[in-house]
Amino acid sequence: MWTTGRMSNAKSWLGLGTSLYFWALMDLTATVLSSTPMPEVELETLFSGRSQSHQRSKRSWVWNQFFVLEEYTGTDPLYVGKLHSDMDRGDGSIKYILSGEGAGIVFTIDDTTGDIHAIQRLDREERAQYTLRAQALDRRTGRPMEPESEFIIKIQDINDNEPKFLDGPYIATVPEMSPVGTSVIQVTATDADDPTYGNSARVVYSILQGQPYFSVDSKTGVIRTALMNMDREAKEYYEVIIQAKDMGGQLGGLAGTTTVNITLSDVNDNPPRFPQKHYQMSVLESAPISSTVGRVFAKDLDEGINAEMKYTIVDGDGADAFDINTDQNFQVGIITVKKPLSFESKKSYTLKVEGSNPHLEMRFLNLGPFQDTTTVHISVEDVDEPPVFEPGFYFVEVPEDVTIGTTIQIISAKDPDVTNNSIRYSIDRGSDPGRFFYVDITTGALMTARPLDREEFSWHNITVLAMEMNNPSQVGSVAVTIKVLDVNDNAPEFPRFYEAFICENAKAGQLIQTVSAVDQDDPHNGQHFYYSLAPEAANNPNFTVRDNQDNTARILTRRSGFRQQEQSVFYLPILIADSGQPVLSSTGTLTIQVCSCNDDGHVMSCSPEAYLLPVSLSRGALIAILACIFVLLVLVLLILSMRRHRKQPYIIDDDENIHENIVRYDDEGGGEEDTEAFDIAAMWNPREAQAGAAPKTRQDMLPEIESLSRYVPQTCAVSSTVHSYVLAKLYEADMDLWAPPFDSLQTYMFEGDGSVAGSLSSLQSATSDSEQSFDFLTDWGPRFRKLAELYGASEGPAPLW
């Protein structure tokens, strides 16, 4: 059975002080677990409070815990407690073993006596307790003498950690003029010590800096305003230092501090005020509408939305001539021109401008009216202005038959300045390119310069200029619109050529054609035309004219029995007159053709030649004749085609020396080069086609391209001869050093890809700075050997082909 040796340990601490000995007796116990219940023992309490009266109390020992103070700083190991077994006779036969958390590292045990010591500094904030196991063994045999027991060593807290503000420093805002006690912010400090033991973790708050403006609640850490009517405009920023002290703020407690930066936010507690009660401004009388005259400014000590201004003109004789707008960026009032100014009419204006806050707070209205006024004097300065027309627009109506030089309007302008300079008038020629009008330079009389024609130009829009004599740069202008009135100066006429048809079997009174007329004039009451036969045809026996009284007329026959063989065409002159003053008329001719018609009245033929054929020739006979002619034409074409495809003899006679050019026109060719071909007849010379004949050197500089013969070989022997001849000519051309290369495109039976040699015109001069390599010329054969020697990099001989 395990027993404790804690009583002797408590007595050994008597030298440390009576109170510590009492604390050790009451709170520090060491117990060991046992398989049997542990009896209650009586422990005499040596001290109780300050009365030091002796008392006796019963207490039940809890044998499974040890208590040890943290942060021990002595040089010797800290004694924790003692383990003892009832089977230990003190002869050293029992061996005590300690295992578990921190065994051998933090805690050690004397295996003979069972004394437990702490060999490292203990920190409760790092680890609050350790769980270990104890066992008693027979030293000689190693056999367990007691069952293994578990116990706990708890680390007793001491005040070794100061309070800390984990969220500091703090930033807070509170409105200015806030009542006393307004909450600003709450600060919180934490203490790492054990809050369940003593006062080590009990924190008390106090303010070290910031009085008398702010206070702090000692328990909650809430900061509040302590002074009324704190004005942001007087002081905006405050730095408050808060202290948190443990041990309930008692002497010896640890403390920590933090800084709280408090800003007073703005409220609208300051009315706007104009620092300048009178403004003097000036503006030119020629200033355009909305141009700026000047600026006024009302100062407001507030900021942001509380400093926004609104400017208005509340009084003055210039309220209708000027306007004021608020610049929201700079909170100034901008005075602008509202209507045109005139120095001659009014030389000065007075305005009363008010500046006010649009956003008000009711609780600060007692601080005074949140508006202010100022007076603005504006002087209008004289400028040299251009002449002004009265009225500002002219509309003139003039008949088109007005004579040249007639005055149609008097244009008037005057100088608005006090000097009243003389004025010269003119017409902007860009507005009157036809030069139909001119204006008197002095009087401004507008007159016609050319005949007017309403049918050509019915409206004229011109611009008349007025210029000061003393200052030609001052020019005024006015628009003049001239409407040309119509007079009856155009006769009516047919709108188109009329051609009518009449059947041979037409009856008297039959309608042939309805005609109408047009007139370029435009009378007020509209057009009205009158139709009749011309005087020279008044007694026409064939046709008559009936006026429909709606600007149209009908052409009717007077008789029947028209014959195409007798007269196939009639020309009927018709007189057309208008209703204008004076009356104008013209004569139009109606062409009437006589046609043969069937019984239904449909026109069959209007050509008189058909009646010249014999009467016995019917329509079927005529068709037969045309068919025979067509067959004969087909036979002729077949014969010509067969003759063109007739076979020619294989051998060309020596006497025949006919050459033809094969020209193809169904593809896109090369122009005149398409007419060039080869004379294949020359290839039939057997003397030059001999196999052993030496090639001749060409002496000409330009090869002649002859025409291609229309005879082609058709036997194998002939083909062999031609092939040999072509090879010989090819070899001769390749070996001829004097034959120049030709860069040309020949179109034969197809559209080719061009010359593989490229264009020699693209070769650059050897004296140029080009770094192009011309070594490829050596691969083009003997004809380009000279170029390869001149332009190639290699000096050696070109390869032979």
From Swiss-Prot:
Expressed in brain. Highest level of expression in the retina. In embryo it is synthesized by the forebrain, anterior neural ridge, developing visual system, primitive external granular layer of the cerebellum and a subset of neural crest cells likely to develop into melanoblasts. Gene3D superfamilies: Cadherins, TCF3-CBD (Catenin binding domain). It holds the Pfam family Cadherin. The chain crosses the membrane at residues 620-640. Residues 641-801 are cytoplasmic. One of its GO terms (molecular function) is calcium ion binding. Its main location: membrane. It comes from the Eukaryota. It is a single-pass type I membrane protein. Residues 60-619 are extracellular. Three calcium ions are usually bound at the interface of each cadherin domain and rigidify the connections, imparting a strong curvature to the full-length ectodomain. This is Cadherin-20. It comes from Mus musculus (Mouse). The lineage of its organism: Eukaryota, Metazoa, Chordata, Craniata, Vertebrata.
